[in-house]
Amino acid sequence: MWITQEITPYLRKEYTIEAKLLDVRSEHNILEIFKSKDFGEIAMLNCQLLFKNFLHIESELLAHMGGCTKKELKEVLIVDGFDLELAHQLFKYDTRIDFVQADEKILDSFISFFPHFHEVKNNKNFTHAKQLLDLDIKKYDLILCLQEPDIHKIDGLKRMLKEDGVFISVAKHPLLEHVSMQNALKNLGDFFPITIPFVAPLRILSNKGYIYASFKTHPLKDLMTPKIEALKSVRYYNEDIHRAAFALPKNLQEVFKDNIKS
């Protein structure tokens, strides 16, 4: 049996699977989990694939991209996603996490897929809310948006950031869909003086790119190496990975020269 991942409208990958382990459907989402010989379990969420053996790559990169460029990480907001492993990584800092996800049925169906599901959900500093309006009014050090936000969402979320806060959002991969990345950079650039694209180096199974945005904090100039060296139980993230994430080939430097703000 095979499952197909759509990388772009014109590019697809196929993966061999052995069996389907789970099929859960809600009003807005479809989650299927498969058993794979090469990749362990594979979750397909609305045609996007998550590989259980490689969950740590994105969660470590995004968590510590924010955590190691900020002196303090006291308040974190995660919206538009299901990745509880991201929260697990963020708990390496002395932080409180607000996690906004309305689809409890799908979130709870990841119970056996996310290795630290119970640990995160039971943490006293973790709050799960169905919508932003359910949360106390506060300012955040770090906001992570796990789907590409439109300008209205950007406008709302940036008002929730502290003056030196960091906003990280998912975008299209800059190499595969550079026009979409350009548009995402332009949208964020209308609200932030610092907007820089990055990817996960050596991650070959993803079609995602990301954008680091901030009013004051710079992902390279403000990187704190001692914080990186103090991290424990990480398998992917280090200083080299952090810096390499922002490297662009010459042709993309030219493509994005009017969109990157640093």
Swiss-Prot record:
It holds the Pfam family Spermine_synt_N. The active site is at residue 155. It is found in: Cytoplasm. It is an enzyme of class 2 (transferase). S-methyl-5'-thioadenosine binds at residue 29. Its EC number is 2.5.1.16. SUPFAM superfamilies: S-adenosyl-L-methionine-dependent methyltransferases. InterPro entries: PABS, SAM-dependent_MTases_sf, Spermi_synthase, Spermidine_synt_N, Spermidine_synt_N_sf. GO terms for molecular function: spermidine synthase activity. Residues 1-249 form the PABS domain. GO terms for cellular component: cytosol. Keywords: Cytoplasm, Polyamine biosynthesis, Spermidine biosynthesis, Transferase. GO terms for biological process: spermidine biosynthetic process. Belongs to the spermidine/spermine synthase family. PANTHER family: SPERMIDINE SYNTHASE (PTHR11558:SF11), SPERMIDINE/SPERMINE SYNTHASE (PTHR11558). Catalyzes the irreversible transfer of a propylamine group from the amino donor S-adenosylmethioninamine (decarboxy-AdoMet) to putrescine (1,4-diaminobutane) to yield spermidine. This is Polyamine aminopropyltransferase. It comes from Helicobacter pylori (strain P12).
